[in-house]
Amino acid sequence: MANLYVIKIGGNIIDDSAKLDAFLQSFAAVDGKKILVHGGGKLATRMAEKLGVEQQLVDGRRITDAETLKIVTMVYAGYINKNIVATLQANHCNAMGLCGADGDAILAHKRNHPVLDYGYVGDVDAINADLLTVLLEK
């Protein structure tokens, strides 16, 4: 596939609505096929605090227990993802939001650490390129 761009944005952009809007306008203007991968910044932590779910971070990495997994899924795959899709659509960039579980887009295994159990945190094993190719070609 010619001209496929895969761009990952992190919390620095996600947490700043002006930066996010400016980035998404620029991203929408890029010609060619593109995939945007995003995290959730501090929003998941703030939501967990509002819901009374204590968060554990070790060296900036989240320890994800069952309740935190629900919140992270809600925030990342729900609110943030759909906000990004809506903003891209408003900028005339046809967009679709997926999470890694959708269509087995991302296959992963539980993160193995010699001392620390990160809970429901995983490391990527494979990307379902066939699925992404079908979606990008439509």
Where would I find each of the regions flagged by the language model?
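Nucleotide/pyrophosphate-binding catalytic subdomain
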Residues: M1-K138
